[in-house]
Amino acid sequence: MTERLIITSSSEIVLKSPTVRRFMENRLRRQVRDALRRKGIRHVYITKGGGRTYVCCSDPEAALQLILRIPGIDFASIAFRTEPDISLMCNAATECLAASLSVGQSFAVRAKVVDNKALSKKDIEIRVGQAILDRLADKALRVNLDSPDKTAYVEVRGADAFVYSDIRDGSGGLPVGTQGKMLGIFSDVALSAVASWMMLRRGALIIPVCLEAQRDQSSVPLATIANSLSRFREWVPVPRLVALILRTEGVLRRINEMTTENVSKLVYLGSILRALDAIATEEGALGVVVANRTMLDPAIISRCRTPIYQPLIGLDERELEKYISILGIGPGQVHEPHGLLAECAEKVPDLALLLDDRELQDEVMSMAKNRETLIL
C-alpha cells in the first residue's frame, strides 16, 4: 500500500532535552492541525518518529503551503509512504523524479535505514537508482553523486519507507507560544510585521497592537496597517488571534500642547511604550516588539518596565526587503516607523520631564484602559 503525505523536520526542536522536546513537538502538532483545519483541510492525522513529523490529510499540496509557514518547521516535502519493499520504493522514487527531471539531467539517491536489518543503505541506493535509469531511459539521465540536479530521498524506518524529492524550506525556529507572549507594535506598512514575524519564529505568540494615529502626514492609516496585519496573520498558527487597537487622539492632543514637532516624535513613542507596559502586565506579555532600527533613548526605554525587543537592528535594506517579500506584503518602504530617530533625543535634555507630565500620563493610561479588540 502506498499513500501520499507530508514529511516535516524540526531541526532546532530535536536539540532540546526530552521533556522540552516532547512539549514543543506536541505544541507544533496541535498548531499544524489547527492551521490546516482553519483553511478547510480535513482528515488531518499527524504522527511522529525519528525526528520527523508525518501529516496525512485530504489535500497534501494545499497543506504543504500552509505548513511551510508554521514556525518550528525546518523543512517539509510531499512524500510517498510504502512498505519497506524494494519494488515499491523503486516505484515511488521513479514517480517522484519523473515529472521534475528533464532530458540529460542528473540525479542521485540518498538512503537512510533505521530499525530495519533486512535492508542496507547502499543496496537501496544502487537498486533504486538503477530502476530510475531503466524506467526513465527515454530521458537519458545521468547519475551524479556530487552535484545532482535532483535527489530522491529514501528513509526506511522500521516497517515503513518514505520516499520524497522536493524539499522545501520552512520558517524554522520554535513553535509559537512556547516562549510566552509579546506585544507587537503595528504602526507602518511593512517593518512592524517583519519585526513581529521574527519574534514569532523564536517561539513568541505575538499580540498585535495597532496604533490609530494621525500624528502627521507620514502617519499610516489604520486601514493600511490592517492589510499588513492580515498578511502577518497567515503566519500565526492559532485558531483565534486577538489584536488590540489604541486610539491615540487624546495622547497626541496633549503632546502637541506641550512640545514642538521634533520633540513630539520622541514623547509619542515614550507614551506608547508606557501604555504597552500597562497592557503587558494585564495580558501576561513578556516583552514589547518595536520595529525601530536605531537604539532607543534610555529616557524612552525607562518608561517601559517590560523588556523591549528590536529585532531589526543590524539588518540591512536587502535583508528587510527579502523578509517583506516572504511575508507577501508587497513593496514596502524601509524606514523608521513614525520617523523616530534616536539621535534626536540628545537634543532634548528635558525629555524625561515631558514624559512624566501628569496630564499626559492620565491620557496614556486612559488610552490603555480603553483599548479595543479585533478578532483575526
Mark where each language-model region is.
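Short glycine-/aliphatic-rich beta-strand segments at the starts of folded cytosolic domains
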Residues: 1-22
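Secondary-structure boundary/capping motif
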Residues: 16, 120, 217-221
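Generic alpha-helical secondary structure
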Residues: 21, 25, 29, 60-64, ...
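Non-catalytic substrate-recognition/targeting regions of SAM-dependent transferases
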Residues: 83-176
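Nucleotide-activated chemistry modules centered on ATP-dependent adenylation/adenylyltransferase
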Residues: 4-7, 23-26, 31, 35, ...
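Non-catalytic nucleic-acid substrate-recognition regions in nucleic-acid-modifying enzymes
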Residues: 34-112
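A short, flexible beta-alpha/helix-coil linker loop
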Residues: 12-15, 114-116, 251, 260
